Amino acid sequence: MAFSGSSRTLTQQSSAASTDDLHKILFSPEAIKEMATKCDLGRHHWLRADDAVCVRPLVPETTSNKVAQWFKTGYEAGKLPSKGYMIIPQVLCAVTRTVTSNAEGSLEIYLADLGDVELAPIDDQVVTLHNRDLPALISFQPTYDCPMEKVGDRSRCFAVVIKRHGYLGHPGSTASVCSNWQPKFSSKNNNYKPAAAGKTLVLPYNRLSELSGPSAVVRLLKSQLNMQSSPLFQLPGGPIMQKAIGSEREEGLNCKRKLPLEEVCTTSRDSVSSRPSVVNGIERPGTL
């Protein structure tokens, strides 16, 4: 059957059943699991001395082969205008160091095509980060869409390549890289205006700022009082409870807090006093 009409018309000829098959391939539990375990999508990857060069494909080979077969079947049946392309609009990577700031070392991160035997960077999509520059955010934008084809014994696909340099005396992890992207597949392809890889240095988080406000100081003092009498762990911003030594009761320092219904209990008539006799090791006068 010869092609007739536009490629859009040919694409629309694909049956709903075939489209459902493609959705099952892309969103099956196995595919989602492999995107995490084999591609590290949205996960933190630690760079160690024994993993100095890391290559992470942006689509698992199993999923890529199934998608390529789906497009090939539609192409040979005359329903699709091509054997399929993988489209990656952008790759974002958050990089943080996991060693002291004066450690001598650097990271080279770039986007590559697994169809290239030398695995060279694609159109200046490469960034070098020194340890002292971290943390940082980097971004990559491919200038073309990748054909769904076999090159030798592997599927052609975009990949993030990370190389660790230096860091003598640091055999463990020296940096953490968390990457995110959204692969798309289409029967059409395009070329894109070249844009250099982006690099944005991020100011380290100032966690001391949380302790500079008056309310933070009050919470700190109350937590210190609480720690002297009871090894309770208190979440930030929650009501702080004080436990008396030698007593099973707990008294809230914030008297305005309303107790939920399940915390309200009836005091026994045999009780001499509802207040503890000893608080923080100081005996309360007038108690038995």
UniProtKB/Swiss-Prot annotation:
Keywords: Host cell junction, Transport, Viral movement protein. The keyword Signal does not apply. It comes from the Viruses. The keyword Transmembrane does not apply. GO terms for biological process: transport of virus in host, cell to cell. InterPro entries: MPV (IPR000603). It is found in: Host cell junction, Host plasmodesma. GO terms for cellular component: host cell plasmodesma. It holds the Pfam family 3A. Its main location: host cell. Transports viral genome to neighboring plant cells directly through plasmosdesmata, without any budding. The movement protein allows efficient cell to cell propagation, by bypassing the host cell wall barrier. Acts by forming a tubular structure at the host plasmodesmata, enlarging it enough to allow free passage of virion capsids. Belongs to the cucumovirus movement protein family. This is Movement protein. It comes from Peanut stunt virus (strain J). The lineage of its organism: Viruses, Riboviria, Orthornavirae, Kitrinoviricota, Alsuviricetes.
